[in-house]
């Protein structure tokens, strides 16, 4: 097969015929890396032969599980470990309740508040009452995406209720997540316990998408679990092969440059890494760069 056709197959996700391939996470999650999927696919297909037999792919900061799903779809014989530190798999179990609450809120606003329009105090109070009265599962990330202005994040229902509300309610139900985590081992533990278990094993790929240092982390279940010390610890634990994500809103690339110049601890792990840059936008911060670096 020509290199061009291999590239096209990677982009189009043709490796798992007759199985649904998710190109975005089933439920909202800030920073789910969907803009990088085609690049992840190309890198995996280039460096891991066939269906990945004998490989272990560890999604260390699992987030939405989208990277784990993508890896398993492309390399079905690899062992894929999804470290679900944010409880995303539990959220997927409650999509029916999430859709019921979405419909209740949608019905309250439809025809009264225009899409993206601000809610009055009276209507906001009505929506809060509907949420409080709802007996099923209440998904904070979904509520924030429906009722807060683009990209805003909160860490609690109380923080949500303190914000201005906007009609950003999704127009249709979320699809089921059937098959999303099929064949994937779901765990939940700290990265500094997880990574060392695989450090002396061959054919282990680390997928590293930590909360970005120096940025707001409210969308993560444990908002303060990744700080400067954790960042430095992660850098020292990292060894090739890996795929590592960062943003220019943090100073990750600058730090890697410093490591190379100063020959600090573990600098060789990042020597001659390759970098892919994707332009991204945020409602408040304008255009910024997301980075994917990798080394095999």
UniProtKB/Swiss-Prot annotation:
Keywords: Methyltransferase, Transferase
EC number, UniProt record: 2.1.1.-
UniProt-listed PROSITE patterns: N6_MTASE
EC top class, as a word: transferase
Keyword Methyltransferase: yes
Keyword Methyltransferase: yes
One Gene Ontology term of the molecular function aspect: methyltransferase activity
Annotated protein name in UniProt: Putative methyltransferase HI_1523
Organism, scientific name: Haemophilus influenzae (strain ATCC 51907 / DSM 11121 / KW20 / Rd)
């Amino acid at each position: 097969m020509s290199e061009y056709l291999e590239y096209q197959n990677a982009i189009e996700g043709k490796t798992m015929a007759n199985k649904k391939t998710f190109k975005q996470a089933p439920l909202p999650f800030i920073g789910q890396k969907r803009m990088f999927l085609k690049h992840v696919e190309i890198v995996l297909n280039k460096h891991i032969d066939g269906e990945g037999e004998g490989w272990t792919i560890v999604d260390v900061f699992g987030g939405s599980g989208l990277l784990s799903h993508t890896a398993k779809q492309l390399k079905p014989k690899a062992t894929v470990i999804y470290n679900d530190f944010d409880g995303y798999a539990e959220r997927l179990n409650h999509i029916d309740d999430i859709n019921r609450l979405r419909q209740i809120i949608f019905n309250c606003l439809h025809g009264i508040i225009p899409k993206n329009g601000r809610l009055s105090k009276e209507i906001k109070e009505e929506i809060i009452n509907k949420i409080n009265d709802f007996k099923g599962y209440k998904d904070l990330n979904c509520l924030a995406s429906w009722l807060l202005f683009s990209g805003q994040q909160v860490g609690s229902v109380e923080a949500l209720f303190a914000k201005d509300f906007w009609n950003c309610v999704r127009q249709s139900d979320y699809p089921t997540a059937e098959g999303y985590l099929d064949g994937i081992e779901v765990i939940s533990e700290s990265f500094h316990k997880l990574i060392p278990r695989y450090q002396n094993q061959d054919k282990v790929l680390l997928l590293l998408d930590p909360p970005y240092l120096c940025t707001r982390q409210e969308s993560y279940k444990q908002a303060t679990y990744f700080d400067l010390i954790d960042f430095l610890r992660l850098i020292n634990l990292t060894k090739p092969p890996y795929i590592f994500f960062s943003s220019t809103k943090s100073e990750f690339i600058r730090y890697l440059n410093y490591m190379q110049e100063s020959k600090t601890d573990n600098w060789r792990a990042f020597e001659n890494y390759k970098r892919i840059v994707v332009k991204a936008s945020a409602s408040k911060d304008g255009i910024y760069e997301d980075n994917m670096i990798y080394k095999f």
